[in-house]
From Swiss-Prot:
UniProt: ATP binding residues: Q87, G105, E106, G107, K108, T109, D511
SMART domains named in the record: SecA_DEAD, SecA_PP_bind
Biased composition (Acidic residues): 862-873
GO cellular component: cell envelope Sec protein transport complex; cytosol; plasma membrane
Bias (Basic and acidic residues) ranges: 559-570
The enzyme's E.C. designation: 7.4.2.8
UniProt KW keywords: ATP-binding, Cell inner membrane, Cell membrane, Cytoplasm, Membrane, Metal-binding, Nucleotide-binding, Protein transport, Translocase, Translocation, Transport, Zinc
Protein name per its UniProtKB record: Protein translocase subunit SecA
Length: 908
């Protein structure tokens, strides 16, 4: 009540922000005349003038009005496009590190040139982030003439480029690229072995186009670089044969047993074995030789089998072909639930992708091991300043504020919106709904209006396509299977009577122009004459006027999405730049959203109204129930994303520590002081194992210490003899004497090969050990994360336990790094400078090969790229052993009882 009164008196926060920026727009407009009067040389010289003023202490905010006026004038001269006042406001919103919500067709790409130009003046680099390589290249090529006219360089980073090309792109004033590529390059840079191999200059300022898609829809998508783990494809096949023998049960009433072997929860996308299911699965596994007689499925050694059963059940009962994935060229390709696009190279994790491959009876790719990872949430929070643009952000304003600290400002449209949004029509069954959609399409086509039909899955788009073919209606289908044709089909989707079926939301980033796109028609001609171009324009103008007179583009939604924002994106395709248009959603009680979240409430309403087959309900109560269901799903998804962030923040803190350590090592030519410090710590810790601090001589284990010193540091020290010969030796002096002996042994090796070679060797060993153990640590963190929910059964807070145990794992990793670095450098004898250079060359080659295969992962997944080659773990190191070579599967000579490859052989 009070807030609504206050809003009437003071205006909303959004209105106040727009009003404040309106004053700056006035100043920019006042400068327009004087800037327009400048000749070409004087206008171009402004960039250097601004840079000089920045160096003298002026701020970007002080330069903003003049810089925006210069960018606007350059746009007029180079591209024939003048920024509207609302576009100037959009530019200010972006410069201030906020999100600008701008409707479809309002010129977001042109708006970005204003803050990009201003912030590029600092020379620190500006990143413009898009959702795919096509848009990155298109936008860079489109805006490059404007930037280059003003003396700024433009680069593009896309997948498949070599390191040199990427370094050049990042060295540019402005760099365009995709969210995936920026994130992967960050990870690759933190796996490099020298500073010269790093591509990025840092994270200064980023403008994220389609910010809702990248920071919200893909927030649950980890970016992971991985290598292969052990092959278990045969096990997936065997388990896949057993799953059809299990009977699905319905969730029981409280206290009642499950009638079946397992239950499925579609909301959380999980499956759970019942008591009878556990017993039956154990019988099946034993019968097929996968479980020892009398063994329990829950024994620690068999948890992997339980994991395989769970993945197979999910593959069969929660993931459907042509909805969640398609099979293409003998591979399972994920379909993005938000856009309907395929995502080649991405794989579900935790064995799910392999289980689906087994289900589809195609080649099973190997599982993988994480080498480096982050999330989009944490990557984009690295930027000093982050901004974004989209047509639909206001519904997620709370999440942008909570997670990223970004405010959303809704920018007014340049022209008022004329689109009509009709109420939803709800039917009892899917068949009735689709028949109503077909009738609507037929009716609209007879009016010579274009129709865009949005579907939630490939399956639905193909079903609708088959119905339209039966009715003899010409149409285009745009889904994950035909995304190569995307831009062309969308460009012509505004022609009179054109019917286009698209999954959500194919063609995003390309406007549907009423009457079709005349520029696309011109582009199809090899060498068009002015007369041909004039004719194409005239024909287009006729079609354009015809469509506007008929009522503009009609958008039909065949299903409500879980997120209102995705529905608004579909609606936003119609009514661009003040054009007329209309939208309508058709629903049924059998739709996923209705069935899982809203069916009972709506069904009761429909029964109360006495609905008959073929009839539709159009009522505010129904719309409210649907909106409530969507809010419920949005809230659940927000909780999932927030929970992911809370868990990943733990790993993120550790990631920062490790990456800073790597950068410090790479930036330093001489790390001998660091080596000396950790050598002292490691020797002291080793001595303490056998001679506890403040203990008496009778408690000392001198033979064990002598053996350990030889094993760990390669020194044969007569400790017992020292003690016998010098009765004054006590715990502290003995510790110092041992350390000195280890140091002396190391110095002797250094004298043989030279200090510079040894310094280089120390760096390479430290980086190699750090990377190897960090990789193992990431795997351990994955395992910890997968099982941490079980702590809840012990009345413990899983998040707190995760933080505590993750810290312990990290502390253990740091201790192991120290120990292994010292052990390796003490056990080797470097021979030649040439061998050091060969080590560096091989390592870079292996890294380059690995980087080429880096892939993004899908939500609820960890990346699995079966072709990635695991980095060689020390096998190329140019050293000669001082001891006899031990087989990897033989017992370790240190006496630990472990296999050599799992103990001291880990780094050799």
């Amino acid at each position: 009540m009070f807030s609504s009164i206050a809003r009437k008196i003071f205006g909303s926060k959004n209105a106040r922000e727009i009003k404040r920026m309106g004053k700056v727009v006035k100043r920019i407009n006042e400068l327009e005349e004087s800037i327009s009067a400048l000749d070409e040389a004087a206008l171009k010289a402004k960039t250097q003038e601004f840079r000089s003023r920045l160096e003298k202490g002026e701020t970007l905010e002080q330069l903003l009005p003049e810089a925006f006026a210069v960018a606007r004038e350059a746009g007029k001269r180079v591209m024939g496009m003048r920024h509207f006042d609302v576009q100037l406001i959009g530019g200010m919103v972006l410069h201030e590190g906020k999100i600008a919500e701008m409707r479809t067709g309002e010129g977001k790409t042109l708006v970005a040139t204003l803050p990009v130009y201003l912030n590029a003046l600092s020379g620190k680099g500006v990143h413009v982030v898009t959702v795919n390589d096509y848009l990155a290249r298109r936008d860079a090529d489109w805006m490059r003439p404007l930037y280059e006219y003003l003396g700024l360089s433009v680069g593009v980073v896309v997948s498949g480029q070599d390191g040199e090309t990427k370094r050049a792109a990042y060295a540019s004033d402005i760099t365009y690229g995709t969210n995936n590529e920026f994130g992967f390059d960050y990870l690759r840079d933190n796996m490099a072995f020298s500073l010269t191999d790093k591509a990025q200059r840092g994270q200064h300022f980023a403008i994220v186009d389609e910010v809702d898609s990248i920071l919200i829809d893909e927030a649950r998508t980890p970016l992971i670089i991985s290598g292969p783990a052990e092959d278990s494809s045969e096990l997936y096949r065997k388990i896949n044969e057993l799953v059809p023998q299990l009977k699905k049960g319905e969730p029981p009433e409280e206290g009642q047993p499950v009638d079946g072997h397992f239950t499925v929860d579609e909301k959380s996308r999980s499956v759970e074995l019942s008591e009878s299911g556990h017993t039956y699965v154990e019988e099946l596994l034993t019968k097929n030789g996968l479980l020892e007689e009398g063994d329990s499925l829950y024994a620690a050694t068999n948890l992997g089998l339980l994991h395989h059963i769970s993945s197979a059940l999910r593959a069969h009962h929660l993931y459907s072909k042509d909805v969640d994935y398609i099979v293409q060229n003998g591979q399972v390709v994920i379909v993005d639930e938000h856009t309907g696009r395929t995502m080649p190279g991405r794989r579900w994790g935790e064995g799910l992708h392999q289980a689906i491959e087994a289900k589809e009876r195609i080649k099973i790719q190997a599982e993988s091991q994480t080498l480096a990872s982050t999330t989009f949430q944490n990557y984009f929070r690295l930027y000093e300043k982050l901004a974004g643009m989209t047509g639909t952000a206001d519904t997620e304003a709370f999440e942008f504020r909570q997670i990223y600290g970004l405010d959303v400002i809704v920018i007014p449209t340049n022209k008022p919106i004329k689109r009509i949004d009709y109420n939803d029509l709800v039917y009892l069954s899917v068949d009735e709904k689709f028949q109503a959609v077909i009738d609507d399409i037929k009716d609209t086509v007879t009016q010579n209006r274009p129709v865009l039909v949005g579907t939630a899955s490939i399956e639905a788009s193909e079903y609708l396509s088959a119905m339209l073919k039966k009715e003899g209606i010409a149409h285009n289908v745009l889904n994950a299977k035909q995304h190569e044709r995307e831009a062309h089909v969308i460009a012509q989707a505004g022609r009179p009577g054109a019917v286009t079926i698209a999954t959500n939301m194919a063609g995003r980033g390309t406007d549907i122009v009423l009457g079709g796109n005349w520029e696309a028609d011109v582009a199809e001609l090899e060498d068009p004459t002015p007369e041909q171009i004039a004719k194409i324009k005239a024909d287009w103008q006729k079609r354009h006027d015809q469509v506007i007179a008929a009522g503009g583009l009609h958008v039909v939604g065949s299903e409500r999405h879980e997120s209102r924002r995705i529905d608004n994106q579909l609606r936003g395709r119609s009514g661009r730049q003040g054009d007329p248009g209309s939208t309508r959603f058709y629903l049924s009680l059998e739709d996923n959203l209705m069935r899982i979240f809203a069916s009972d409430r709506v069904k009761n309403i429909m029964q109360a109204l006495g609905m008959q087959k073929g009839e539709a309900i159009e009522h505010r109560m129904v719309s409210n129930a649907i909106e409530k269901a969507q809010r419920k799903v949005e809230g659940r998804n927000f909780d999932i994303r927030k929970s992911l962030l809370e868990y990943d923040d733990v790993a993120n803190d550790q990631r920062h520590v490790v990456y800073e350590q790597r950068n410090e090592i790479m930036a330093t030519d001489d790390i001998s002081e660091m080596i000396d410090a950790i050598r002292g710590d490691v020797v002291s810790a080793t001595v303490s194992q056998f001679i506890p601090p403040q203990s008496i001589a009778e408690q000392w284990n001198v033979p064990g210490l002598e053996k350990q010193l030889e094993s760990d540091f390669g020194v044969d020290l007569p400790v017992q003899q020292w003690l016998d010969e010098d009765k004054r030796l006590h715990e502290e002096t003995l510790r110092e004497k041992i350390l000195q002996a280890v140091v002396d042994s190391y110095r002797e090796k250094e004298e043989v090969v030279g200090a510079s070679v040894m310094r280089n060797f120390e760096k390479q060993v430290f980086l190699q050990v750090l990377d190897t153990l960090w990789k193992e640590h990431l795997s351990n963190m994955d395992l910890l994360r997968m099982g941490i929910h079980l702590r809840g059964y012990a009345q413990k807070n899983p998040k707190q336990e995760y933080k505590r145990e993750a810290f312990e794992l990290f502390q253990n990793m740091l201790d192991t790094i120290k120990h292994d670095v010292v052990r390796v450098i003490c056990h080797v004898r470097v021979q030649k400078q040439e061998e050091m250079e060969e080590l560096e060359r091989r390592r870079r080659e292996a890294l380059a090969q690995q980087m080429q295969r880096a892939q993004a992962t899908h939500p609820e997944a960890t990346e699995e790229d079966s072709d990635a080659e695991e980095q060689a773990e020390g096998s190329d190191a140019p050293y000669v052993r001082d001891h006899k070579k031990v087989g990897r599967n033989e017992p370790c000579p240190c006496g630990s009882g472990k296999k050599y490859k799992q103990c001291h052989g880990r780094l050799e």
